[in-house]
Structures are given as structure tokens and as C-alpha cells.
Amino acid sequence: MALSLTNKNVVFVAGLGGIGLDTTKELLKRDLKNLVILDRIDNPVVIAELKTINPKVTVTFIPYDVTVPITETKKLLKTIFDKLKTVDILINGAGILDDHQIERTIAVNYTGLVNTTTAILDFWDKRKGGPGGIICNIGSVTGFNAIYQVPVYSGTKAAVVNFTSSLAKLAPITGVTAYTVNPGITRTTLVHKFNSWLDVEPQVAEKLLAHPTQSSQACGENFVKAIELNQNGAIWKLDRGTLEAIQWSKHWDSGI
């Protein structure tokens, strides 16, 4: 069911960098009620700029590192819910691309996303009297087919796709819907220089950028279109300036 973002309260994890920042700018054109940006690094200049895009929207920045214990995330979310009373959408966008940092890549790209999602279920889960909500998780096309020189990063993104697809199937129980947006190669600082696993390909960034890419602005525009389409369980591919729903092939079924 299509979703109007007018007067919605949105929490955006990692909404200040790369794809996140251009998506934030696009969201602000939609007359949200509140946009709460949770990010590890404060950038007052950018926050001030964002506040001028649409004075109707209240933009709030709160420092947040997705690798903190889940108890800390729950405390932070409680302060947000106490202030706003309700949150309509959670966007999980934290991510790093550096296969030298194996544990941190998993912690930021996957564990942090799972913990933030699990924490907000305390407030949304209809079994606890919650109103439900919408989760938008940022994956990557590498979650479909890996960039094999960065298997750790690619593996975390495959995990995000599977985790989110499971959340979508649990919506009748929890009242919380979910989908992934999966950008292709996008011209951001993330891909300009990064390390391959065990240095198997020292020129991996240069070789990747030799292929067709997209701007973060084009990606952000399609990102918001996907949010407005609001399809539970969707696996969106945002590549080369296009938006496409992926039909996932089923090769096995648990039968439960």
C-alpha cells in the first residue's frame, strides 16, 4: 500500500553520509513531521543546512554508534518515543566497507542493524500493545551476488537481505513490516578507497569504479520512492539510476 510521508516521524540511522545524506535531503521534501538522525559523527554545518531545506520539518540530531549494547539502544529509543510519542519509520543505514576490519564490519553492517531493529520492537510489537511500524534496511546488490574480493562486506549484506525478508514474514505476528533497499555501485567516499580481504585485490576500488555507477542523489531519489511504495517484503535494487523490485528465487523451504 502506497505511503504518504506527510506528517510522519522518521528515525534515520546514519542519515548524514553518502547515500544517507542525499536520501535525507529527499525525505525533507516530503513534509515529514519529524526527522531524527542518529549518526556516529556530528556535523553541525550539515545539520544546519538540512534544517533550511524544509522549515516545516523538525530535524533532530542524536549521536549514536550502532555497535553499542542493545540496552543502550533501547534507552535511546525510549527518549525518542517519549518525545515524539510515535515513530512511523526506522531506516537502518549504518555501513562500512573495509574487509581488513572483519569484526567491525560485521558489528556495524549486520549486528548493529539487528540490534537496532530488535530494540524498536519493544515499542512497536503489537503483542506488547504497540502500534506496529515500518523498517527500511539498507542492503546492497552485493547481498545478491558478492563482490568476491570483499567477502566479509558482501556476506553482511546478504545477511541483511535474509534478516529483513524474515521480518516481513513475521509482520502478521508483530505488526511491523520491512523491506530492503539495495544500492548498486554509487559514487560515494565509501567506494573511492577500500580494502579487500587479505589484500587479494589491491586495486579493487579502482576496478569497481571502472564499471557503470550512479550518483548518490539519483540513488536517494529512488530510495524515497521505495519508501513511498511501502511494499512489505520487497527487495529493491537501486542501480544505475533505476528502481527495480527483485524476485527472489526459492531453492529451499523450511516447511514451517
From Swiss-Prot:
Q: Does the keyword Electron transport apply?
A: no
Pfam families per record? adh_short
Q: Which GO terms describe its cellular component?
A: cytosol
List of residues binding NAD(+): 12-41
Does this UniProt record's set of keywords contain Oxidoreductase?
Answer: yes
Q: Which domain of life is it from?
A: Eukaryota
Q: Name one GO molecular function term.
A: aldehyde dehydrogenase (NAD+) activity
Q: Where is the active site?
A: 153 (proton acceptor)
Q: What is the E.C. number?
A: 1.1.1.1
Record keywords? NAD, Oxidoreductase
Specify which residues bind substrate according to the UniProt entry for this protein: 140
Per the UniProt entry, what are the Gene Ontology biological process annotations, in alphabetical order?
acetaldehyde metabolic process; acetyl-CoA biosynthetic process from ethanol; alcohol catabolic process; behavioral response to ethanol; NADH metabolic process
Catalysed conversion reaction: a primary alcohol + NAD(+) = an aldehyde + NADH + H(+); a secondary alcohol + NAD(+) = a ketone + NADH + H(+)
List the InterPro entries. Answer: ADH_Drosophila-type (IPR002425), NAD(P)-bd_dom_sf (IPR036291), Sc_DH/Rdtase_CS (IPR020904), SDR_fam (IPR002347)
Family assignment from sequence similarity: Belongs to the short-chain dehydrogenases/reductases (SDR) family.
Quaternary structure, per UniProt, is: Homodimer.
Q: What is this protein called?
A: Alcohol dehydrogenase
Q: Which organism does this sequence originate in?
A: Drosophila ananassae
The gene for this chain is Adh
